């Protein structure tokens, strides 16, 4: 909390600081000082800025520091203590979630689809407080086909018909009725057919011009795979209480599809699918997700890694404007050095391809200089010294 004249003074000091410190730090500093519960004087503003500046300068990497090696060691060494299994999601019997080393490998490999895709969907205020309304949204999201609510399927070969016996428990669980199922079946294009109800949970479909049993089998598959409702890719949607609100946890992920569902808070949807985030929200959002997912995986195992090492990994993976894996098909495979590529994987192939193309090795990086025993251009090796002969 500061008065108006001190506020002008603060803005002046922050504008001077902006030439030396990133905008994000200045923004947090401004917010902390203006929202402080106690009044801050000019002298205290100067002292705060001095401490922030000192901390910032002491946190900078020294010129010539091998930051790649330090980051690799800082993430890789704790990785040896991580678990190798897929666990049940906490408190939810039906869902599994990949944790530990397999999940870390998935992230840095930038896999197109994670082994256990999941979403955490937060709801708008009126839906988040009421369990029944949250359940209604979950039912709208969960992808449901006819086969998901059918108990038995019988073929009437003589009358060329298909008789579906619906499961009342499953219908109630999915929030559906027999009429809903009947409605989607009537919309199907399968030639001339009529739909009959012998009782509340039975639907019979009879075909007028069906000539073969094979055609009947094909019609059965088409009916069973017909979508009733939901978002494609969401196999299961479960409600959990988180703090004082209800959230939806899903088995499966479809960020674009869920954004259009009524009741969903679009500003707080979370998914563990990197490529979905990249295609829907852009590469900056994907970069943020890589950082957050790696940090979460490490913290779940009780491992504390400095965020800067993790951010270096996410920066390298997204620096070209798209998410690329750290491997021979991504970051490492695009190195200009022949020896660096050969040292990583498939050595002979890289050497033969480079020889056929007539590539030139310039020995600018670390790996290639170590291979031939030259001093590397890091640390004291960055500097080229010239000696001035002494005057005799």
Curated annotation (Swiss-Prot):
Record field: catalytic activity: RNA(n) + a ribonucleoside 5'-triphosphate = RNA(n+1) + diphosphate
Matching InterPro entries: DNA-dir_RpoC_beta_prime, RNA_pol_Rpb1_5, RPO1C
Disulfide bonds: none
Single GO MF descriptor: DNA binding
EC number(s) from the headed UniProt entry: 2.7.7.6
UniProt-annotated location(s): Cytoplasm
DNA-binding listed as a keyword: yes
Keywords: Cytoplasm, DNA-binding, DNA-directed RNA polymerase, Nucleotidyltransferase, Transcription, Transferase
DNA-binding listed as a keyword: yes
Entry's Gene Ontology cellular component terms: cytoplasm; DNA-directed RNA polymerase complex
GO biological process: DNA-templated transcription
Gene3D superfamilies reported in the protein's UniProt record: 1.10.150.390
Enzyme class: transferase
UniProt record similarity statement: Belongs to the RNA polymerase beta' chain family.
Assembly and oligomerization: Part of the RNA polymerase complex.
Stated role: DNA-dependent RNA polymerase (RNAP) catalyzes the transcription of DNA into RNA using the four ribonucleoside triphosphates as substrates. Forms part of the jaw domain.
Protein name: DNA-directed RNA polymerase subunit Rpo1C
Native organism: Metallosphaera sedula (strain ATCC 51363 / DSM 5348 / JCM 9185 / NBRC 15509 / TH2)
Taxon lineage: Archaea, Thermoproteota, Thermoprotei, Sulfolobales, Sulfolobaceae
């Amino acid at each position: 909390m500061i008065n108006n004249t001190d506020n002008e003074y603060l803005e002046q000091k922050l504008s001077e600081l902006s030439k030396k410190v990133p905008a994000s730090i200045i923004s947090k500093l401004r917010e902390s000082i203006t929202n402080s519960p106690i009044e801050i004087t000019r002298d205290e503003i100067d002292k705060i800025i001095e401490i922030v500046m000192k901390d910032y300068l002491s946190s900078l990497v020294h010129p010539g520091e091998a930051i790649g090696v330090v980051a690799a060691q800082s993430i890789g060494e704790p990785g040896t203590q991580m678990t190798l299994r897929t666990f049940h999601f906490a408190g939810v019997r039906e869902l599994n979630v990949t944790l530990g080393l397999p999940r870390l490998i998935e992230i840095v490999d930038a896999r197109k689809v994670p082994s256990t895709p999941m979403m955490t969907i937060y709801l708008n205020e009126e839906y988040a407080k009421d369990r029944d309304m949250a359940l209604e949204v979950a039912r709208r999201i969960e992808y449901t086909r006819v086969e998901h609510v059918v108990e038995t399927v019988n073929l009437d070969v003589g009358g060329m018909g298909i008789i579906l016996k619906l499961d009342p428990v499953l219908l109630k669980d999915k929030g559906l009725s027999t009429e809903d199922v009947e409605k989607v079946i009537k919309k199907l294009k399968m030639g001339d057919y009529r739909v009959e109800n012998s009782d509340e949970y039975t639907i019979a479909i009879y075909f007028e011009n069906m000539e073969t049993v094979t055609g009947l089998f094909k019609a059965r598959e088409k009916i069973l795979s017909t979508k009733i409702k939901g978002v494609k890719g969401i196999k299961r949607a479960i409600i959990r209480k988180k703090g004082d609100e209800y959230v939806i946890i899903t088995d499966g992920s479809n960020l674009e599809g869920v954004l259009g569902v009524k009741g969903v808070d679009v500003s707080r949807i979370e998914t563990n699918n990197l490529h979905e985030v990249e295609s829907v929200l852009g590469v900056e959002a994907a970069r943020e997700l890589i950082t957050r997912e790696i940090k979460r995986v490490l913290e779940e195992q009780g491992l504390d890694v400095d965020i800067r090492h993790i951010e270096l990994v996410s920066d390298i993976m997204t620096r070209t404007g798209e998410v690329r894996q750290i491997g021979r098909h991504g970051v490492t495979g695009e190195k200009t050095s022949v020896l660096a590529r050969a040292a990583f994987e498939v050595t002979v192939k890289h050497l033969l391809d480079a020889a056929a193309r007539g590539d030139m090795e310039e020995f600018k990086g670390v790996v290639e200089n170590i291979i031939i025993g030259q001093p590397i251009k890091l640390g004291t090796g960055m500097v080229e010294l010239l000696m001035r002969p002494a005057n005799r």
